């Protein structure tokens, strides 16, 4: 009997430790969610990927725990309702090594008010829970909770949002403050009572509350763009003030890089690539060409563009310009090409940056090389007019590439200033007005408006020198030019490619050498095969028969053996 009680005591101690371990792994700070009647609310909880996920569930806490939905990695979803589980809950694994479990509440009312429990069961971590308290706001005056603002900030900066802007609201201990964040209809509580309570991995160690309930977010990241932060102040029961602030994030791109693909063929085709990295939210790439050709020279020019988003959320733009000359230049002709990037900046400004220039002297053997460009120096003259642009609150998608022809018959083209510093001009569109004087612009290239698919203007005489066309649209032009353009250029180090004296390009020479080697190799193989065939057709050499074998006998005196002559006959 004594041994039985001992075993029971040891078993009870082990069970107490197991239960204690599970309770220690269970966590959850209650968050208050405020919603208006008839609105949609999304409740989202997250947890770190530690151990093995057993299951997760949503429950409503009343006198008892009412199961709403369960998710199991192997068995899928189960919902205790007539509606489909896909319209009630959602499970995701977003970046950041976390699990995300969302409950959708549609058309909320007073019956929806209550506490909702989100729980994760992990092995061997245990059970982790999070409780949300949903409260329906009633008798809220419309003019009290609608107060929206927008803040623009550069990446890696410190975001400071006052609870109420341009409002003489006296801070009192009687008032209840709470900061919430909203994205795509999902609303989460960041702080309550002046203390951060959100366990979201996106805002971990980045949120701080000031003495006057200002929200500080540092450092600002790319994925903060579009977040709406709301400050809720409960003045008295049924009276809630709300001020919402939307964040717009900007990133200054790198200086564009321009290179030439070493693939010029016999018809004089040149391919240039302009690349721009770390772009957010958008940018425009514009090609500039300064050239001087004798009369009768013709060319075809078109651009293509592409963009992609890297793993950090930045955009990378690339524009490819192809220029093909029909005739071989009879004289020494120069070609200078570069690209410019325009991207929006906070405060309705624009970041301007220009690539280095590449200068070619077609038909010349030893072209000069220019000196490098100072990035803060104006290189193109007077800034263009941007009177029709608007603020960066509604940016267009980037047109990515445009083409500007600087060479005309006798026109004087005023080019935009290319500086890396900010300029006090609106940022949407980046369309320019180019002015020219002299003869009619009938010799200029046809154009297409940026970011549209409309056809070029009718007639070559209706276009202006320096027009911009969409990079993704092929626009071929035959432009005879009769005069050189004198333009002030800052010298920039460029890549210079010269042609041989005889005018033959190096790909043709390499192809001829390879063809000669191939012919010689084929002749050698053919000669070897003929030699092998002759060897196989020769008759086999004559081989004489072997000589006869003679046997010798050694006679012994013992026994009656046969004499030697008899053995020889055998």
UniProtKB/Swiss-Prot annotation:
Residues 253-359 form the Ig-like C2-type domain. It is found in: Membrane. Residues 38-125, 156-222 form the Ig-like V-type domain. Keywords: Cell adhesion, Disulfide bond, Glycoprotein, Immunoglobulin domain, Membrane, Repeat, Signal, Transmembrane, Transmembrane helix. It comes from the Eukaryota. Residues 450-461, 469-486 have a biased composition (Polar residues). Its main location: membrane. Residues 526-570 are cytoplasmic. One of its GO terms (cellular component) is membrane. The chain crosses the membrane at residues 505-525. InterPro entries: CD96, Ig-like_dom, Ig-like_dom_sf, Ig-like_fold, Ig_sub. Residues 373-403, 441-486 are annotated as: Disordered. Disulfide bonds join 45-118, 163-231, 274-339. GO terms for biological process: cell-matrix adhesion; inflammatory response. Glycans are attached at residues 42, 107, 148, 156, 166, 184, 261, 284, 334, 352, 374, 431, 484. SMART domains: IG. Residues 22-504 are extracellular. SUPFAM superfamilies: Immunoglobulin (SSF48726). It is a single-pass type I membrane protein. Residues 1-21 form the signal peptide. Homodimer; disulfide-linked. Interacts with PVR. May be involved in adhesive interactions of activated T and NK cells during the late phase of the immune response. Promotes NK cell-target adhesion by interacting with PVR present on target cells. May function at a time after T and NK cells have penetrated the endothelium using integrins and selectins, when they are actively engaging diseased cells and moving within areas of inflammation. This is T-cell surface protein tactile. The gene is CD96.
